[in-house]
Amino acid sequence: MRENKENDARYDLIVIGGGPAGLTAAIYAVRSGLNTLLIEKGICGGFLNEIPRIENYPGFKQISGMELASRLKEHAADYVEIREIEEVLRLSQHRGSNQKSSDSFSSSADFIVQTTKQSYVAKALIICTGTRHRKLGVVGEDEFLGKGVSYCATCDGFFFKNKRVIVVGGGDSAATQALFLKNMGCDVTIVHRRDSLRAGKYLQRMIDRAEIPILWNSEVKEIKGSDRVECVVITERGNEREIPVDGVFVAIGEVPNSELASHLNIECDDSGYIVTDRNQRTNVERVYAAGDVSGGVRQVIVACAEGAVAAMSAYEDITSEP
């Protein structure tokens, strides 16, 4: 049972983020005996909720991302307290009375987690905050968000049935979204800035079979319209032209949600991903990171594995303290 002191709920471990890494970490942590809380700013599942079909997660020949997310959450909820729609605003570390403000973070001090609802205290933290969609950064992108511009075909594809859409990008996400939209009955074209796709060969073959056209060596420079998207400005090998479209689906990668790392001086790489060792430990004692926020191979099964490793490392470090 958790204790209360000075109105702060106290835990052994707080997991921040309810994607595959966070949910798995929470399961492993509680099963090892750690009093654990999971905090998720939205709903559990993360990007899983946007994946229309998964065919490489062991145990399921085919499953939707939303269904897998639901099963992971249901499993975790049997073990751990989950608080959704609660965003972590600030991380800090309590200093003992004999510690000077200039001292580095103490290895024995508790962490204070301040959210939109209350504050919590924990002996250890696992950061599993994932990533967010990278933006094109062009005129009209923000203006028409929700009015023709989208980052999630699974979420918004239904509204574009029998309409003209483009998918911007050349990786697995772009290919998957294009195929989903094609199956929804959309008139789909892929716009890619290079002369070949980065998506896996299996997805490329599916794109070919679906006869989805691709504009090679092309970039979106502007999104235009009145109340909704009406066309995009494309540059292809220096030549500029307008293409009439009803929807623009952006799939050009992700940016790590690692802003909380700066609160504790947690090391990040040049791209903003949290740096960890092979046991998911960061440079700050009793702080761990797992899943997409720590970079590496961004796959669901890898995120789950990293979450499990992080929880085991946390258990080892907490129980080894005198």
What are the functions of these language-model segments?
Residues 132, 137, 143-159, 252-302, ...:
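FAD-site-proximal beta/loop scaffold in flavoenzymes
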Residues 7-79, 163, 173-200, 215:
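Beta1-alpha1 glycine-rich phosphate/pyrophosphate-binding loop at the start
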Residues 76-96, 107-114, 119-122, 182-278, ...:
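A Rossmann-like FAD-binding core segment of flavoenzymes
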Residues 17-22, 130, 169-171, 291:
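Conserved phosphate-binding and hydrolysis motifs of nucleotide-dependent enzymes
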